[in-house]
Amino acid sequence: MISLKNFGLLFWKRFSENKLNQVAGALTYSTMLAMVPLVMVIFSIFSAFPVFNEVTGELKEMIFTNFAPSASDMVGEYIDQFVSNSKKMSAVGIVSLIAVALMLINNIDRTLNSIWHNSQSRSPLSSFAIYWMILTLGPLIIGVSIGISSYIKIMFEQSEHLSLGLKLLSFVPFLFTWFIFTLIYTVVPNKKVKIKHSAYGAFLAAIFFTLGKQAFTWYIVTFPSYQLIYGAMATLPIMLLWIQISWLVVLVGAQLASTLDEIGEQIEQ
């Protein structure tokens, strides 16, 4: 049985070998390029299903708050303008935007597989099918989850005798984040990953993501010196910094799950 100290040393060794700080920076750049195409695809899919009309506003709030917790209103206005402009594009332009979104998913796929040291690549056709499924079904899953959460929230708010339920309801965003991370760490690597290892890594990532968002918002609000330096351009560095922190959290959780997998395989041998 490996000690906690040795586990920590192995985790840090793998984290350094995989250069996850630099990888988070590269994914941040890819995310900035793919953000508008992703949002365009998501809301285009939502517009095709009238049942999601009521949750579209909540989805926008969730996306903008997670990408830039302290500047969500301004980011939301910019993204809305970009998406509105994209509707005037030709078919070739739209295909190009979708290709950029698929490239981001491909980068995420390759990054997570490298963390698991998986050299077995999927066939191009299989990869495209999986990426397209993520791009199309992902928004629907998120929409259904938001709709269910909204329904539960309304149900609890209409009752005066469910104060405990209202308190428990505050954990729904965390549980949803935990579930999404667990799903990513289990499905994306092109190898069998034990669900409990994915859940452990996802739990750590969900905690860091939730606390990090609150701490980041507090820092930006409490120490607004960045506004004096950047002025009207302050939103851009804020968003870049938060996206990089978010990717670092995702990669830390993935590395934890991968390290647990590695130790588990050594014990079985």
Swiss-Prot record:
It is found in: Cell inner membrane. GO terms for cellular component: plasma membrane. The chain crosses the membrane at residues 32-52, 89-109, 128-148, 168-188, 203-223, 232-252. It comes from the Bacteria. Pfam families: Virul_fac_BrkB (PF03631). The keyword Membrane applies. Keywords: Cell inner membrane, Cell membrane, Membrane, Transmembrane, Transmembrane helix. Its main location: membrane. The keyword Translocase does not apply. InterPro entries: UPF0761_bac (IPR023679), Virul_fac_BrkB (IPR017039). PANTHER family: INNER MEMBRANE PROTEIN YHJD, UPF0761 MEMBRANE PROTEIN YIHY. Belongs to the UPF0761 family. This is UPF0761 membrane protein HI_0276.
